[in-house]
């Protein structure tokens, strides 16, 4: 294997591929990335046995070949080389020689035969989305993914299709048991996804990587795996093997008290008042009455803060306690200037809606007063 490659193009792909590599893996080959040079193209792969990534980059090759080398070391070397330079890589026996300007590096290379194979998914159940559409679906819901490993079936986004009139919609739902986020997108083709759970790690990897691509992505779903393809990039992930709860049952249908408030003012007030509460579970008490919201916070060491925000509210007075962090997490998903809260009583779930986005809905569970 002998090739020359642009430092920028090579580093871009290495950054993508190395993002899933576990440097602490007890299986040495999994700390490596796979390199294959063939016909002026480099194939670069990595896997942690749950997620696999493959990407191609153009090069000027004089000899084909393949090998695996330590992912972190190779990526760091290329990152520290001179910008806009040409990097030369050559395999000599079990050593990968790297040349850049006046620098020369030698890395130990393991046989490519030991590296796990990459098997693309059957594209029978596939559909195309634009990258902004894909990012929007994930960004609207990922904040509600549970990090509690004992409830592993909540450690991802529930992905399924629903009938939306004459169209099919792709719906994403996430919940940690204290809040829920739901959004959907109409599809142009009649794909059928009965219900799969995309792992949190897969979602976060895509969030880091998709910003480097433009145009469309192809998503393929099977009963056990999911893949996403964009340009010369493909990522495949195992699905979470579990049953997502019936989320429809926790969406209230009788919340009859409506409140509308200017979103930025509301979030800023929550942020200011909650500053006094540095407890592990920061709380704020909201009093709804007479076209206003009174926001109050008290910490275990007797710090206090309160602020009143104007709102449109004509129902009976109500007092509800919330985790302030859960409210503030909504700041990144509310697009409109105002937001709507649908209330029932101090112990029932609260529905949060964005007048500018009819496709999304959020649920907040109150805390005990």
Regions found by a protein language model. Give the residues of each.
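Structural preference for solvent-exposed beta-strand-turn elements
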Residues: 1-369
